[in-house]
């Protein structure tokens, strides 16, 4: 393996920083017989991210896999959260992932090969009290993944997302110790390896933790055509259970599926 390890080495809230965190992982990789380089740049700095990617290109000539896993936490209920804390979490998780993707993208297009893994979260997929900033950023990564997978298809660039549950510095204060003991980080690794492999799927959201693996989907129900008119709001309220009924739901192949479904129903109702 040839791995460039990026870690700002800061606290969980993003403050501070040291190159020691990345170097520790590099030392472990080298001890196992791999090649590795350390990088302590902040993923919120696009110029630094471009330099990081160039560091890998200079060393090994190409970048085959990108795993976006940089993250911080600044948890508070939304009512008590400052917008500075909201923005910083979004900048690290979402813009950091976008910057890294943007920096590797031309290299992957040129070599007609790439595998990108976004680290999303159950908080982004389903919500979690006190994590509005984190949840917004993590679900935004899924939207980025969906579109990049479509745009990358013709270049053999597969883009997926992984929602891990693992005991890390970021989660150790959120769960009791017996739960943390069950959530060994290495239990998530198989999911990441599958998504980064040459035979990886694309536009897939895998969930992993404690040895269990699931898939998450964003679906679209069959829906109900009610037309246009002053009576529609009341009709929608009455038939909302029918609209939200999941029987026959689909996993759209792109965002166009929603509009296609709606226009088809309108044409049929004529």
Where do the language-model regions lie?
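Residue(s) in the substrate-gating loop at a strand-loop-helix junction
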Residues: 121
